[in-house]
Amino acid sequence: MSTSRVNDEPHKLSATAAALCPLSNCQFSGVVISQIADEQRLEFTNKYKGSCTLLCSYDSQGVVLRIVLDNDQGHVLKEYMIAADTDAAQMGKRSYAVSLESDNLVLRFASEQDQQLFRKVVENVKHLRPKSVFSQRTEESSASQYFQFYGYLSQQQNMMQDYVRTSTYQRAILGNAIDFQDKIILDVGAGSGILSFFAVQAGAAKVYAIEASNMAQYAQQLVESNNVQHKISVIPGKIEEIELPEKVDVIISEPMGYMLYNERMLETYLHARKWLKPQGKMYPTHGDLHIAPFSDESLYSEQYNKANFWYQSAFHGVDLTTLHKEGMKEYFRQPIVDTFDIRICMAKSVRHVCDFLNDKEDDLHKIDIPLQFHILQTGICHGLAFWFDVEFSGSSQNVWLSTSPTAPLTHWYQVRCLLPMPIFIKQGQTLTGRVLLEANRRQSYDVTIDLHIEGTLISSSNTLDLKNPYFRYTGAPVQAPPGTSTQSPSEQYWTQMDTQGTRNTTGMLNGGLSVNGIGDGGMDITHGLIHPH
């Protein structure tokens, strides 16, 4: 591994966090590191010139061990991962043998106490061998990618700068200060800790901020720089694996993903209820997933034409057509993340409720939603549109956060799932079927759609991969669906201009006549044309 620059010492976590999480950051100085040169003769050679400092920090997969020289802590010489299957053994009172990657090392510590503490770090990792609920349901590669993603400040910034999201959370918490005043709060998936700060603003006595990514160290820095370390304890780890010293009065979290359920963070949110006191509160309290059939020929054609790339029989002299079917399947397995005008929806949305106070984790493993839509307009149904609302049910007021296409846009946007075979449906007909969300170990869902026009043999279905969406949003203003104008848009515009007092300006351009003179039988402008001699 190439060397990298160390900008700061590992940030010290609060005493409470250190006591609660045995894998908290720690370091050992004056360590002499030897490498086993000959296992049979037990011959050792010094791996580095001079003594080293070992920097240990918690990671979602175990403990990251970084080695730097005592007299030059500016560069990381080597980085290892101490995992549950790491082989290690004590050698005497001050030495410890450990097998890391392809290196068999002997670490000689400056004191017996250091050796004992390091041994405890390794043993604590080994105690993680029995998989937690999170580990059982999640592939290691997916978890690693997930926590790495949320460990970047840029990703936290993206969420924090979602004004609707952040301001709604703050208003929900501060507007229900009675639920937080002098209370014990648990912040699940705290990230930067912004919700923990809101809880303190509302008068919380103590906040336990749980964060499994490396963002925990940045959250700790914010806590200390804002002088609230006596209020907020940042605990690195997963809620499924850490221990708290007490029950809490309120759990706060932002666990929603695309289509509400993506990332499977809601299960973690429900799991956290094991620390909630009887009659405790959840912020948010419940979520509503809305589903509606939509018509959008432009979107359908866009995806269809992408797949037609594979229909070429002479691409640089190569026949690609054998892959056309698979290409079509792949493009239509992608949910579309963007926004739209709600007038493309052909019926009132069906609402599926997730009760965060009472639903069980297992309830989210297979979510079967029956559908029945009374069609309001004739047209071609290209698929189903999804969005969600969540409610914060407080003692003083209820606050809603909406991702509806009628609400201000958020970083969740909306999601649409296309049908490879659209269906023509008439106003007054009933469209029935189901949406089945089946959880997978990639922290997402396989989404199966089955639709049927009642009283006919017409049906269509599709299965999509929510883990692999197509991010289509461009920032351009949302356009009204074609054919929604019931009056002349040109006349409407000029009428509005007249109403706004622009008669004089337009009159100058039209011989002193009102532009909307056409409304009184029309205006012949041909007399004003200049004819060449």
Curated annotation (Swiss-Prot):
Molecular-function annotations in GO: histone H3R17 methyltransferase activity; histone H3R2 methyltransferase activity; histone H3R26 methyltransferase activity; protein-arginine omega-N asymmetric methyltransferase activity; protein-arginine omega-N monomethyltransferase activity
Enzyme Commission numbers on file: 2.1.1.319
Position of the signal peptide: none
List of residues that carry Asymmetric dimethylarginine: R503
Reactions catalysed according to its record: L-arginyl-[protein] + 2 S-adenosyl-L-methionine = N(omega),N(omega)-dimethyl-L-arginyl-[protein] + 2 S-adenosyl-L-homocysteine + 2 H(+)
Binding site for S-adenosyl-L-methionine: Q156, R165, G189, E211, E240, T268
Location of the protein in the cell: Cytoplasm; Nucleus
Post-translational changes noted in the entry: The dimethylated protein is the major form.
Keyword terms: Chromatin regulator, Cytoplasm, Methylation, Methyltransferase, Nucleus, S-adenosyl-L-methionine, Transcription, Transcription regulation, Transferase
Domain SAM-dependent MTase PRMT-type: 143-452
Cellular component, GO annotation: cytoplasm; nucleus
Keyword Methyltransferase: yes
Biological-process GO terms, alphabetical: chromatin remodeling; peptidyl-arginine methylation, to asymmetrical-dimethyl arginine; regulation of DNA-templated transcription
Protein family according to the UniProt entry: Belongs to the class I-like SAM-binding methyltransferase superfamily. Protein arginine N-methyltransferase family.
PANTHER family on file: HISTONE-ARGININE METHYLTRANSFERASE CARMER-RELATED (PTHR11006:SF10), PROTEIN ARGININE N-METHYLTRANSFERASE (PTHR11006)
Role of this protein: Methylates (mono- and asymmetric dimethylation) the guanidino nitrogens of arginyl residues in proteins. May methylate histone H3 at 'Arg-17' and activate transcription via chromatin remodeling.
Subunit structure: Homodimer.
Protein name, entry field: Histone-arginine methyltransferase CARMER
Gene that encodes the chain: Art4
